[in-house]
């Protein structure tokens, strides 16, 4: 958790340093106070955020299994579904907390360095963008949860999750016509909501795809967790 906070702060600080350097070095205003959080979001969504989600998911399932703390948890008067749901909920709360922290920090930094460009609608777009990013990242995290209940070793799950992430991004580019079926291609789906013209059909289609994938991954993950010999 501490590592996530430190790296998130570094991402925001480095981003602002880059923007300030370009502004003073070339005389160009790259982004304003409300555009800066969107730039930061684009960066962390494809780098730090999924990486943090992978680490947390592995720690919750493979980590507890290897340290035998899972057995202690299951000895309590609670069903396996309750344990699994609690772990998934904690994973979801971690993603929400990380997004909220980065959003507030990047907004603060943006206001400090570019106070004149702040606007109410800009802030609304930032909040909407960060909120919408939760769904695709959470669905990807459920893939890691599924892998954690299939493979025993945490290191193997980590590398496989990274390969899945890279593979989905690669296939989303190569097979652009079918990119909607690769969850990582929807990490930036918030742009559909904040653009000048809103494509309602595409938004609805992606909501259905992510919801369907999320339900199937959660159900399959729980089935494997329930059958798992701890």
Locate the predicted segments by residue.
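Secretory targeting signals
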Residues: 3-55, 85-150, 193-212
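Transmembrane helix segments
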Residues: 10-21, 150-190
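Hydrophobic/aromatic residues in alpha-helical transmembrane segments
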Residues: 53-57, 70, 105, 143, ...
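Helix-loop-helix units of permease transmembrane domains in multi-pass membrane transporters
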Residues: 60-93
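Transmembrane helix-loop junction
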Residues: 63, 76, 107, 111, ...
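Junction motif at the cytosolic side of a transmembrane helix
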Residues: 212-230
């Amino acid at each position: 958790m501490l590592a996530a906070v430190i790296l998130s702060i570094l991402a925001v600080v480095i981003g602002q340093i880059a923007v300030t350097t370009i502004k003073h070095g070339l005389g160009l205003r790259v982004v304003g106070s409300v555009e800066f959080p969107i730039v930061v979001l684009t960066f962390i969504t494809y780098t730090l955020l999924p990486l943090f989600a992978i680490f947390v998911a592995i720690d919750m399932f493979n980590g507890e299994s290897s340290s035998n703390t899972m057995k202690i948890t299951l000895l309590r008067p609670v069903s396996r579904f309750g344990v699994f749901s609690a772990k998934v909920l904690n994973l979801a709360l971690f993603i929400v907390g990380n997004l909220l922290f980065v959003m507030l920090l990047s907004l603060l930094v943006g206001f400090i360095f570019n106070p004149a460009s702040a606007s109410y609608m800009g802030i609304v777009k930032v909040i909407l963008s960060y909120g919408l990013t939760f769904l695709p990242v959470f669905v990807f995290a459920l893939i890691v949860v599924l892998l954690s209940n299939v493979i025993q070793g945490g290191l193997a799950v980590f590398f496989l999750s990274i390969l899945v992430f890279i593979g989905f991004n690669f296939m989303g580019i190569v097979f652009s016509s079918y990119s909607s079926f690769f969850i990582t291609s929807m990490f930036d789906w918030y742009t559909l909501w904040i653009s000048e013209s809103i494509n309602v059909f595409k938004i609805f289609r992606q909501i259905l795809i992510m919801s369907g994938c999320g339900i199937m991954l959660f159900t399959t993950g729980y089935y494997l967790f329930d059958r798992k010999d701890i």
